[in-house]
């Protein structure tokens, strides 16, 4: 997950992407790039994908679940054409097929331009939620010495608590206050 990965929200640097792509190309090791959050950047688009650096040696995985509707459970991949038969076979072995209705819905929202208009709206909402979360963390946890990531996209913030604070013990208190986290 090079873009805004779960759980830290971090993004792979341009230098690291270049190094991974060069190593994969030199060794012939294929790159499977899972980028479900790649469209959820806030101010600046991420660097070019790993897959764009070596299209014949890469498989790029994307998702509509994060930018359109989680219930659709629909994604896509970009791969060398020679891999399609094996990828299709693996997909069919996993779940036979994705419901046709879901596929048609996504095809329509792409075709009529809705998705292009919708994604900036989603980005703005996630950015506002990120800003609210960072402000709350600063207000509530800042005095404790906790540290957290400052994600530039995606849905995740990684918090490191001081050793004296126990995340497992804090979880029930957070739930009682109407909030949850993964310890």
Predicted features along the sequence, with ranges:
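PLP-dependent class I/II
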Residues: 1-183
